[in-house]
UniProtKB/Swiss-Prot annotation:
Protein name: Adenosylcobinamide-GDP ribazoletransferase
GO biological process: cobalamin biosynthetic process
Pfam families per UniProt: CobS (PF02654)
Top enzyme class: transferase
Protein species of origin: Prochlorococcus marinus (strain MIT 9313)
């Protein structure tokens, strides 16, 4: 019995967006994997949250746990999005005329290093501030970060259309609003579950409600602003959108929520 195409796309997203082992007995498909990126984000964020809880329970200092969790997130994604962040920062610094050339350069420039440093420091500060609320915040940030490229693909042309080895297939095979269905299912589930948690007085419903409201803004604004500045999007700017939205979401949650 052949697996449905959506399941093969999910298996493809699992391989493409993470370093996790492939699913046995299922041939992955890669044409429409972007729609499942938010689901993969929840898995990766869940693993980060799990590590946080295990180490905190083992009486590790919060500062050490924070560094390990951020390192785990970078490793689980294969550095894919961080590489895109650095390349995009270098491209923006070079100006629109030399943007793609700078982004294609295998050498990382000063702007790329600066962007990476700022993002990591902001994530560290945010997680330290969130404290016990960090595990839920990691899940929320990972989800919204992977939603950001969906808006970029819907709104902007691909800058390297036709070039081999690029992420242009994300736009080529997309089917309009259907690409947002998996993410919408997660939001619908969250909106259904949160009220029941509030009834039983679960304290962390504040994080869920704030995350649903806070994360949506950067998920749209970051890819929108990047697309306008670059004149379109590429695989690098998709990755940059993921990292920037994750970081901004964590920062906003840290600012708006009481210390955990």
């Amino acid at each position: 019995m052949r697996a449905p195409l959506w399941l093969r796309d999910l298996a493809g997203a699992w391989i493409f967006y993470s370093v996790l082992p492939a699913w046995p007995g299922l041939k992955p498909r890669f044409e429409r994997i972007a729609r499942f990126a938010p689901w993969i984000g929840l898995v990766l964020g869940g693993l980060q949250s799990f590590l946080w809880l295990v180490l905190i329970r083992a009486d590790w200092p919060t500062s050490a746990v924070t560094l390990l969790v951020i390192g785990l997130g970078a490793w689980l994604s294969g550095g894919l999005h961080l590489d895109g962040l650095m390349d995009t920062a270098d491209g923006l610094a070079a100006g629109r005329e030399r943007c793609l050339q700078a982004m294609d350069d295998s050498c990382v420039g000063a702007s790329g290093v600066q962007a990476l440093l700022v993002v990591v420091l902001l994530q560290i500060a945010s997680l330290l501030r969130l404290g016990s609320l960090a595990p839920l915040a990691l899940l929320i940030a990972a989800f919204w970060g992977r939603c950001a490229p969906l808006w970029a693909m819907a709104r902007f042309f691909y800058l390297r259309e036709g070039q081999a080895g690029t992420a242009s297939f994300h736009r080529r095979y997309r089917k309009g609003w259907q690409e947002a269905l998996p993410a919408c299912l997660v939001l619908l589930l969250a909106l259904t579950v949160v009220p029941s948690l509030m009834i039983v007085g679960w304290p962390s419903q504040m994080v869920l409600m704030a995350g649903i409201g806070v994360g949506v803004l950067p998920a749209f604004l970051v890819p929108e602003l990047l697309g306008r500045r670059l004149g379109g999007h590429s695989g690098d700017s998709y990755g940059a959108s993921v990292v920037l939205v994750e970081t901004i979401t964590l920062l906003l949650l840290a600012v708006l929520l009481p210390a955990g």
